[in-house]
C-alpha cells in the first residue's frame, strides 16, 4: 500500500502571473535557496514530472502549520502575524519560484464528475505526481482496476445570481428605479465617519509608492485554492493539516488523500477550501441536512478509492465552520498571504496600525459592515407587529370556507393502488395561489367522472407575495388560536425555491427543498406548537425540484382529503418522489 505523506510539498501548475513573480530567475538565484532544491530543478526527472520533495519546502510547510496553530494561544498578536508571515512566506515563495521554471503542461480538462488518479507504488523519496487538473497519460502507470475516482456531488440548484461585471455605460433613465442600498448593521453615518476621519487619512500618510510592483494584482487574480484536510487524530479530537495550493481540490484529494475518508464535505471561503471527513462529522453529532448528505455506507464501501464530495452551504456550513474553527484558519491564511503580496514596507505600515487598534480596543468597536439578511421593510414590519397582507388575506378568506373545509373522504383503494399513476399524471397545476387552492380544496379528480365544486372560489382573491422568514413566522403565529382552521400558504424564494405549508386542524404539512433564507426545522422548533409533517425534497436540479414539488402537492391533496392514509403517502414519497419525511410533535 502506498504510504501517504499528508504534509508533503508539491508543485502546482504554472500560471502567467506566478511565472513573473519576484521578477523571474534573477531574484530566485539571489535568495540563495538550498542546494538540494536547486539541484532538483537543474536535474529534472526523465519524464519531466515534478516528483521530488524538497526538504526545505517540507520544513517550511511544517513551520507554517505550527504558526497557524500558535494563533490559538494567548500570544502577542503582532508576534503571531510576523512569525506566520515569515514561515508561510518561505513555503509559498518556494512554490512560486519553482513554478516559474516548470515545463509547459497540457491544457486543463473540462470539469467532470469523475477523475482517475495514480495509485501505483512510488519510489522512496519521490512525491506523487501533482493532481492539479492537468491531463496526463495514466495508462502508462495503472489499469482501470487500480484507479481512484472522485465525484463532486455539488448542489445542482442554481446559486444566488450576483452580477459582478461592470457595465460599459449607464444612463439616468436606466438607473433611477434601481435601489443600490444595502441595509447594514451599523448606520451609514457611522461607517462614513470612520472612513472619512480615520481610515483614509492614515493611509494617505504612506508615501512610498512602488509603481512597478505587481505582487498584489497577481495575488488577487490567482484562481488556485489553499487546500486544508480536516481529519481524525489519534491524540486530539481532530486535526487540520495544510495540504497544497492547487487548482482542483477534488483531483488532489482523490489522488493523495482518499485513505483519510472517501466521503468529504467541502467548505469554501474565497481561495481556501477545507476537505472535512464525513465520518469525523458523524462522530461530532452535527446534524447533516438531508439535501447535503453524501452517499450511504453501502455505496461508499463498494469502492474505497472512489471519493464523493458535497459542497456545503447555509446553516450546515456555519455549523462546520464554528465547530472546527475554520474561520481562524481562513483569517490566518488570508491575512498572511495578503500581507505578503503587499511587500515588506506596506505590510509593516498596516501591521503597526492594526496592532495599535488592537491595543486600544478600537479594532473591536468599529462599525461592522455586515448586511442584514432581510430588507428594511421586513425589519420595520416585524418591529411594529405589522401583519403581512398576504397572511391576513389567507386567514380572512379561509374563514369563509371553515364550514366546508378540505373535502372529507374515506381511504380509497383505487387511489392507494394507483398512486404512482395519479401523482405523476400531467396536469395544469401551477404555483399560483388560486391553482393550488383548486387542487387542495376541490374534490381531487383522480377519475374523470368525479364532480368538482367551488370550495376555493373565495381563495382566488388572495394576492401572493414573495417568501421570507418573516412571512413564514407570521403565518404560524396567526394560526396559533385557529385550532380548527383549514388553510395553506405558498411561498417562492430566490432561485425559484418553493415552500408550501398546509394546515388541517392541529396538523401542519410542509413541502420544501433546500431553502437558503428559511430553516424549516428551526422555525418549527421555535414555534413549538401542534404537529408538523415535513416532506423535504432531496438535492436535485431546479427543473426536477419544480416537478417533484408539484407531484408532492398532488399527494398532499390526497392526504388532506382522506383518500390516502398518511403512512402510505410517506412510503410513496420516500421511495418514488426522492424526498425525506420528518415529524415534529408538541403538546
Curated annotation (Swiss-Prot):
It comes from the Viruses. GO terms for biological process: viral genome replication. Keywords: Early protein, Transcription, Transcription regulation. Pfam families: TATR. InterPro entries: TATR. Regulatory transcriptional protein, which trans-activates gene expression from early baculovirus promoters. Can also trans-activate its own promoter, suggesting that it is autoregulated during normal infection of insect cells. Belongs to the nucleopolyhedrovirus IE-1 protein family. This is Trans-activating transcriptional regulatory protein. The lineage of its organism: Viruses, Viruses incertae sedis, Naldaviricetes, Lefavirales, Baculoviridae.
Amino acid at each position: 500500500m502506498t504510504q501517504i505523506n499528508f504534509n508533503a510539498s508539491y508543485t502546482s501548475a504554472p500560471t502567467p502571473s506566478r511565472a513573473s513573480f519576484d521578477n523571474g530567475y534573477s531574484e530566485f538565484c539571489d535568495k540563495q535557496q538550498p542546494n538540494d532544491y536547486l539541484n532538483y530543478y537543474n536535474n529534472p526527472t526523465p519524464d519531466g514530472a515534478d516528483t521530488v520533495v524538497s526538504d526545505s519546502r517540507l520544513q517550511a510547510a511544517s513551520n507554517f502549520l505550527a504558526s497557524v496553530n500558535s494563533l490559538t494561544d494567548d500570544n502577542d498578536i503582532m508576534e503571531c502575524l510576523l512569525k506566520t508571515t515569515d514561515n508561510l512566506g518561505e513555503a509559498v515563495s518556494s512554490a512560486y519560484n519553482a513554478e516559474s521554471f516548470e515545463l509547459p503542461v497540457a491544457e486543463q480538462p473540462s470539469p467532470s464528475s469523475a477523475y482517475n488518479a495514480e495509485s501505483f507504488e512510488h519510489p522512496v523519496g519521490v512525491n506523487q505526481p501533482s493532481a492539479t487538473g492537468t491531463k496526463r497519460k495514466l495508462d502508462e502507470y495503472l489499469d482501470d482496476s487500480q484507479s481512484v475516482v472522485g465525484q463532486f456531488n455539488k448542489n445542482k440548484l442554481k446559486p444566488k445570481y450576483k452580477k459582478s461585471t461592470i457595465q460599459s455605460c449607464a444612463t439616468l433613465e436606466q438607473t433611477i428605479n434601481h435601489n443600490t442600498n444595502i441595509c447594514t448593521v451599523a448606520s451609514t453615518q457611522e461607517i462614513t465617519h470612520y472612513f472619512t476621519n480615520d481610515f483614509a487619512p492614515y493611509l494617505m500618510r504612506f508615501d512610498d509608492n512602488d509603481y512597478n510592483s505587481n505582487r498584489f494584482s497577481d495575488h488577487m487574480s490567482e484562481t488556485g485554492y489553499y487546500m486544508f484536510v480536516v481529519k481524525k487524530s489519534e491524540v486530539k479530537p481532530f486535526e487540520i493539516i495544510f495540504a497544497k495550493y492547487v487548482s482542483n481540490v477534488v483531483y488532489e484529494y482523490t489522488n493523495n488523500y482518499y485513505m483519510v475518508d472517501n466521503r468529504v464535505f467541502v467548505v469554501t471561503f474565497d481561495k481556501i477550501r477545507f476537505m472535512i471527513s464525513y465520518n469525523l462529522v458523524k462522530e461530532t453529532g452535527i446534524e447533516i441536512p438531508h439535501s447535503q448528505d453524501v452517499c450511504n455506507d453501502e455505496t461508499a464501501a463498494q469502492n474505497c478509492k472512489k471519493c464523493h464530495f458535497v459542497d456545503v452551504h447555509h446553516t450546515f456550513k456555519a455549523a462546520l465552520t464554528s465547530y472546527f474553527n475554520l474561520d481562524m484558519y481562513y483569517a490566518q491564511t488570508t491575512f498572511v498571504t495578503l500581507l505578503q503580496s503587499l511587500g515588506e514596507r506596506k505590510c509593516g505600515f498596516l501591521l503597526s496600525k492594526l496592532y495599535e487598534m488592537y491595543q486600544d480596543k478600537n479594532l473591536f468597536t468599529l462599525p461592522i459592515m455586515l448586511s442584514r439578511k432581510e430588507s428594511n421593510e421586513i425589519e420595520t414590519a416585524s418591529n411594529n407587529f405589522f401583519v403581512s397582507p398576504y397572511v391576513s388575506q389567507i386567514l380572512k378568506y379561509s374563514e369563509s370556507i371553515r364550514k366546508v373545509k378540505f373535502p372529507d373522504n374515506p381511504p380509497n383503494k383505487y387511489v392507494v393502488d394507483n398512486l404512482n399513476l395519479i401523482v405523476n399524471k400531467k396536469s395544469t397545476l401551477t404555483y399560483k395561489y388560486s391553482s393550488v387552492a383548486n387542487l387542495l380544496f376541490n374534490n381531487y379528480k383522480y377519475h374523470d367522472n368525479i364532480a368538482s365544486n367551488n370550495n376555493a372560489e373565495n381563495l382566488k382573491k388572495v394576492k401572493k407575495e414573495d417568501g421570507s422568514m418573516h412571512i413564514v413566522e407570521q403565518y404560524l403565529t396567526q394560526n396559533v388560536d385557529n385550532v380548527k382552521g383549514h388553510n395553506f400558504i405558498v411561498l417562492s424564494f430566490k432561485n425559484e425555491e418553493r415552500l408550501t405549508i398546509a394546515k388541517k386542524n392541529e396538523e401542519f404539512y410542509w413541502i420544501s427543498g433546500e431553502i437558503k433564507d428559511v430553516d424549516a426545522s428551526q422555525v418549527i422548533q421555535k414555534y413549538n406548537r401542534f404537529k408538523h409533517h415535513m416532506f423535504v425534497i432531496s438535492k436535485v436540479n431546479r427543473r426536477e425540484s419544480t416537478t417533484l414539488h408539484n407531484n408532492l402537492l398532488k399527494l398532499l391533496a390526497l392526504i388532506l382529503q382522506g383518500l390516502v392514509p398518511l403512512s402510505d403517502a410517506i412510503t410513496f414519497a420516500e421511495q418514488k418522489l426522492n424526498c425525506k419525511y420528518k415529524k415534529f410533535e408538541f403538546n
